[in-house]
Amino acid sequence: MKTTSFISTVVALLGAYSVGVSANLPDTINVHVKNLAPEDTIYDRTRQLFYQSNLWKGMIEVWDNKRQSHFNVKIDGVSSGGDGEQQMSGLSLLTHDNSKRLFAVAKNSHSFDFSPNQKNDGPSSFHCFKLPLSEQSKPEWSVYLQGVQDEFQRQTGRRPFGVVQSAQDRDGNSYIAFALGMPAVAKISPDGKNVEAWAHEDGNGGQRPGYSGITFDPH
């Protein structure tokens, strides 16, 4: 009985606090930007910049918090006004400090459309940028991922799709995680010329399994 009374009191206090805080917030916040949807953020400690992926528009926003300024980096064939075939998902840096490269993963815009319109074979891609970035920056190299998806399907009978994130090892190889179809990771060489169906696991029945992220432990 004492426990029940204590929990009820805590819930009541939390409810009162919640109401008090929310009373000062506006009921509606209007953001007049078409399809603005942040997906991933990474911080460049050396340059003190944030890199933000814009999901729907397929762009990378570079934000300088000190100067309160920003610019967008566009990728040909990926960036759009919000209705393109690809969407920007994960970002990663080659190294924790003094990174010379930024990597960007772009998934097909119909990958996570859980309806009859969902696609597992639409265009998706992976891009390597030299740092520092400018508004005119273009990828040093780009890889389209249909080929490695085909290879996974040939090996396993299942097709991974919905690329979401990448990580880089000490040698500069990239590892790209697929979130849907099957749990799978593709490996890409530092120059982008070799793409390998590197690792996979069996799917979990009729569910849509996969990896939602990946990171590299240097230790």
Locate each region found by the language model.
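Short loop/turn segments that connect beta-strands within beta-propeller blades
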Residues: D64-Q68, K130-E135, I188-K193
